[in-house]
């Protein structure tokens, strides 16, 4: 784990650490900041690695904005494209449900992924997803970042074909103060058929708070 400005976290990439710290600062005591509070001039060195997702009326989660480095990683402009289109086919449903959960429950999520190129290269990435609110109070956007764990000479030259999810976990509000020993993976939560997503999220948070109390 790495100590950042808001506490202990499992993030290991400077880009995701910095944007999470920024998001945490501007939200203050709220569960999520207003999208109008996000000032590009405050994080100019991160812009190329940032993205914003939105939910369309048909339920699709799409890129509203994608930084130049992200577009270069995949060899195309991602604006308007479904977020799930970047992922391995068997993971589309889990990825979309996680993005919706970040907005519905105003709770950030952290992914560890492996990206595979069209010629067989692979690289590890860290992805952070954080909720944003509109002026009407609705939590209807996701601010995120995609960053490689280590530099690779072929990145941004040979396009990625898809991402594969290796691990995912929630970053509840208390996470900025104390890091529990283990966070239940999101893909386990969304796969649970016997309980709703909201109930599962509340159960996870309850477990985390109990761990902190001990």
Model-identified regions with their sequence ranges:
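Regulatory/sensor and coupling segments of signal-transduction and defense proteins
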Residues: 2-7, 150-214
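Sensory/regulatory domains in signal-transduction proteins
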Residues: 2-166
């Amino acid at each position: 784990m790495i100590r950042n400005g808001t506490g202990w976290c499992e993030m290991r990439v400077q880009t995701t650490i910095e944007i999470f710290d920024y998001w945490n600062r501007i939200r203050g005591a709220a569960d999520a900041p207003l999208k109008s509070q996000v000032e590009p001039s405050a994080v100019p060195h991160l812009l190329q690695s940032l993205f914003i997702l939105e939910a369309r009326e048909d339920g699709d989660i799409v890129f509203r904005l994608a930084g130049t480095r992200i577009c270069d990683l995949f060899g195309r402009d991602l604006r308007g494209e479904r977020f799930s289109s970047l992922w391995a086919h068997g993971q589309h449903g889990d990825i979309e449900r996680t993005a919706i959960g970040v907005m519905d429950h105003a709770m950030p999520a952290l992914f560890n992924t492996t990206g595979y190129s069209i010629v067989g290269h692979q690289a590890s990435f860290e992805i952070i997803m954080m909720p944003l609110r509109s002026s009407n109070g609705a939590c209807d956007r996701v601010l995120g970042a995609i960053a490689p764990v280590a530099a690779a000479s072929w990145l941004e030259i040979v396009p990625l074909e898809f991402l594969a999810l290796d691990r995912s976990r929630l970053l509840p509000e208390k996470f900025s103060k104390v890091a529990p020993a283990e966070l239940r993976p999101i893909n386990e939560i969304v796969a649970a058929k016997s309980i709703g997503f909201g109930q599962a999220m509340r159960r996870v948070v309850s477990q985390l708070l109990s761990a902190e109390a001990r």
